Design a protein with these regions (language model features):
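N-terminal and secondary-structure boundary signal
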Residues: 2, 6, 17-152
């Protein structure tokens, strides 16, 4: 499974921290990717700069936005990137109610906001949930996820 989060390609990174104990080489400084203008072309350039092409069936997790809302990445901005990796936009229904609490309404919101015009949209918990083991987890031994995660 390979998932791409659009936030993972934006120009943010955490600084490298050295050990307070010393005694080892400092970790390599992280690469920082920066573009002055956030454009469809620059979204693709940032992705390509990672030099880690996505292979297999790829899921892009982003918010398709609440019905009538405006707090989501515009499809025109991400279309070229989403289509470059030939993938599917994925989300889960909301647990807090609202206009994306049911799969039917969620898909309508995705269509109304233009996401279904640029890529397939898969509501991960449309067919229920599945339980996946967490290997060597500190707090959890299993996680409940939308069943469609098994398709990726």
């Amino acid at each position: 499974m390979y998932m791409v989060s659009l936030l993972s390609i934006l120009p943010f990174t955490a600084p490298a921290c050295g050990s307070a104990q010393g005694g080892g080489e400092a970790p390599e400084a992280p690469k920082v990717y920066f573009v002055r203008d956030i454009t469809p072309e620059n979204m693709v350039r940032l992705y390509e700069a990672l030099e880690r092409p996505a292979t297999g069936k790829v899921a892009v997790k982003l918010s398709t936005g609440e019905p009538g809302g405006h707090n989501f990445l515009k499809p025109e901005l991400i279309k070229d990137l989403v289509q470059k990796v030939d993938d599917t936009i994925v989300e889960c229904n909301t647990a807090y109610g609202g206009g994306r609490a049911s799969t039917e309404n969620h898909l309508k919101a995705a269509a109304d906001h233009g996401f279904t015009a640029i890529a397939p949209v898969d509501i991960m918990d449309a067919d229920g949930v599945t339980t996946l083991p967490v290997k060597d987890g500190k707090w959890f031994t299993e996680m409940h996820m939308g069943k469609n995660i098994l398709n990726y």
